[in-house]
Amino acid sequence: MDQQIYSLQKKVEEHKEELIQLAKTLISYQTPAPPARNTEGIQSWIAGYLNELGFSIDKWDVYPGDPNVVGKLKGTDSADYYSLIINGHVDVAEVKEDEEWKHDPFHPIEKNGLLIGRGASDMKGGMACVLFAVKLIREASIELPGDLILQSVIGEEVGEAGTLECCKRGYHADFAIVADTSDMHIQGQGGVITGWIEIKSSQTFHDGTRRNMIHAGGGTFGASAIEKMAKIIAGLGELERHWSIMKSYPGFKPGTNTINPAVIEGGRHAAFIADECRLWITVHFYPNETHDQVAAEIEDYVNRLSDSDIWLRENRPVFKWGGSSMIEDRGEIFPALEVDPGHPGVLALTASHQKVKRECPIIDVSQSVTDGGWLYDAGIPCVIYGPGDLHNAHSVNEKVSIEQLVEYTKIILDFIISWCSRKKEQ
């Protein structure tokens, strides 16, 4: 088998133009999110590609115009051999009108050993590598004992959980790789959750009554919801500082766990005391925490702060956490993902990496978030491992090294065969 894998890896080199053309084809589909609802074309193409390779296809709309595609290659001995999910998203970062691209971002070019175009690094380059590796395996008539599941999902760029929908649909495996941007480091990640904190007064007052609320002898029990929200914002800053002192995680700089007061909305008219205010926050947390845990910590802190305020005791803050889409309901959740370096899947991926790169892979944490947290949250051991680096993801003239695409294809090819040909440990 090792000799057969080596022969296939040589084919990656010999046919790298086919790999590059495959990446160019994926990039040429204009799938920015926002605006989203534009992935039907690329997903139909991927479904057709996998169907021709013998995969059973499951394609369904998550949103109109945005379908998920899952291809499954049933193993010859699924019960006894390890199964694998490889996951990737086909939406890309938006391209704004004022961005100064040197060429059309959706007509990719090669220059100085780089592939340039929107999504080259994040993460259509990685998707192309996986598809090409699978094509070579199928053309070589290699039968995998374990199941191989490829997930091509939508919505990652805007917090739409295409991957969560795959989990809800019942897709599970012994190990998963998210082929997203990691510069070929094996990575875990912290998590992100957004939330709304709303204060609403039980009464509405005219602007002319403000003096009666804020001066001695005024006799009116009332307050501006905006000013009370300012008190909560200050309190969140105190909690954030407490976290930075008391919490830590290897690979993250102290204070990476943040509470960002991102958007504030409030009041109804300049002639009224603000009777409502809403604060939209973004919370970053560490890999060993859950989004439910940090949300509960924030609620507890804000509620205790409210207990110390006479008006807030009577007009309690209300919390709404997460959401299914930054587009649809202005909310998102990216669960954290913790890597176990001793897991058989991580050890096998390390071995595949070493065979090609002649060095151990770096195992660390991403400074961003991916859909990997949803797989981990569903009980699937998972890592982020893909070509491209975060400095290029979302950037003007986004690019990825062609050499890295070739290397990654060789590694993922070796890993698919090795892992899916390995008997489960009893």
Curated annotation (Swiss-Prot):
Binds 2 Zn(2+) or Co(2+) ions per subunit. Zn(2+) 2 binds at residues 122, 157, 394. It is an enzyme of class 3 (hydrolase). Keywords: Cobalt, Coiled coil, Hydrolase, Metal-binding, Thiamine biosynthesis, Zinc. GO terms for biological process: thiamine biosynthetic process; thiamine diphosphate biosynthetic process. It comes from the Bacteria. It catalyses: N-formyl-4-amino-5-aminomethyl-2-methylpyrimidine + H2O = 4-amino-5-aminomethyl-2-methylpyrimidine + formate. PANTHER family: ACETYLORNITHINE DEACETYLASE (PTHR43808), N-FORMYL-4-AMINO-5-AMINOMETHYL-2-METHYLPYRIMIDINE DEFORMYLASE (PTHR43808:SF24). This is N-formyl-4-amino-5-aminomethyl-2-methylpyrimidine deformylase. It comes from Bacillus subtilis (strain 168). The lineage of its organism: Bacteria, Bacillati, Bacillota, Bacilli, Bacillales.
